[in-house]
């Protein structure tokens, strides 16, 4: 596995050298930053709900969105979805997720084949027995015809059973057999690489192929992608499948992908969270962004630093203010990205007592240190390391929000550019 040192912001890290792939104009791999993507959970045949969810995911920051294409009605809806999104100003690339009958759907619906930016193929269910290679080739030939990239996406839950059985039998015949887990990992990697080689033999360029090998256990994911990275230079899509709900899914995905990303492995990521009933699908986009930003690989939104609280901070004022500021930033980012270039790098601190509050606030671009229990009820505000104001009274939160807005305008706004 070859690597080069790439520096995004102030955090250099060894980045595995992969072949860049253009997905609807978004570059995955090569020297491009790690791309955030997501997937809808709507019925794709329902154009209205799918358009609404894709638009929400795109507004949240998803740079590629995958949609299910599982039947004729779904395939027929894809060009309508693409057209509607473009009218709404959402030019996000759409990826078609195909299983079992993708070859037939692409052949029967050429407008769908044209509207999609990428096709996802699962080697484990693209076809069975003597039909497998033919149906895989049909999709690859469609990709060549329409000049589209493909993701060869292996999933341990639908792994090619013939390949797995062959490797299990071969392993059993050897004197010092590997564990069943090791054979499973090898089968996943081989399935991806064999399929990629076949696609290239058919005529699809390596700059049109992305690989993924998804499992549900953290150590398996680390092992499988390390093997893939060592044995190919294809662009890699990272994702922990069936990660779960809530904090479990967030922690598992972040643990696995954080280790791989730190090693320079991974060109695009998706955080696969099981949404709670009525939950917000865009949560997975936010988590992916925060993972990359926390590790210093990309910047998406200003991050608010806030202390966790202790016995000195019995008041909830600083917690409420930190939440308000973070929510306000998230809500305004679609506008701010256009109006204030570079605002993603802003750092804000909302601290709760005198112990670390002033110091942390000085380290941020703009910070506030609220009083802890028994401390003087005055609130110093620091801008670029210097104390600029002391707030008092019931309007502290509103006053600080205005100061943050003014700081953004003065530092990142048009007036600053004209003055310079």
From Swiss-Prot:
Q: Which GO terms describe its molecular function?
A: 4 iron, 4 sulfur cluster binding; 4-hydroxy-3-methylbut-2-en-1-yl diphosphate synthase activity (ferredoxin); 4-hydroxy-3-methylbut-2-enyl-diphosphate synthase activity (flavodoxin); iron ion binding
Pathway participation: Isoprenoid biosynthesis; isopentenyl diphosphate biosynthesis via DXP pathway; isopentenyl diphosphate from 1-deoxy-D-xylulose 5-phosphate: step 5/6
Cofactor field: [4Fe-4S] cluster
Q: What is its EC number?
A: 1.17.7.3
Biological processes annotated in GO: isopentenyl diphosphate biosynthetic process, methylerythritol 4-phosphate pathway; terpenoid biosynthetic process
Highest taxon, organism lineage: Bacteria
Which Pfam families did the record assign? GcpE
Enzyme class, one word?
A: oxidoreductase
Q: How is the cofactor bound?
A: Binds 1 [4Fe-4S] cluster.
Q: What's in the keyword line of the UniProt record?
A: 4Fe-4S, Iron, Iron-sulfur, Isoprene biosynthesis, Metal-binding, Oxidoreductase
Instruction: Cite the binding residues for [4Fe-4S] cluster.
Output: 307, 310, 353, 360
Could you confirm whether the keyword Oxidoreductase appears in this record? yes
Reaction equation(s) it catalyzes: (2E)-4-hydroxy-3-methylbut-2-enyl diphosphate + oxidized [flavodoxin] + H2O + 2 H(+) = 2-C-methyl-D-erythritol 2,4-cyclic diphosphate + reduced [flavodoxin]
Q: Keyword Nucleotide-binding on this protein?
A: no
What InterPro entries does the record point to? Dihydropteroate_synth-like_sf, IspG_bac, IspG_bac-typ, NO2/SO3_Rdtase_4Fe4S_sf
Sorted alphabetically, which PANTHER family does this protein's record hold?
4-HYDROXY-3-METHYLBUT-2-EN-1-YL DIPHOSPHATE SYNTHASE, 4-HYDROXY-3-METHYLBUT-2-EN-1-YL DIPHOSPHATE SYNTHASE (FERREDOXIN), CHLOROPLASTIC
What the record says about family reads: Belongs to the IspG family.
Cited function: Converts 2C-methyl-D-erythritol 2,4-cyclodiphosphate (ME-2,4cPP) into 1-hydroxy-2-methyl-2-(E)-butenyl 4-diphosphate.
Name listed for the protein in its UniProt record: 4-hydroxy-3-methylbut-2-en-1-yl diphosphate synthase (flavodoxin)
Which source organism? Brucella canis (strain ATCC 23365 / NCTC 10854 / RM-666)
Query: In the UniProt record, what gene is named as encoding this protein?
Result: ispG
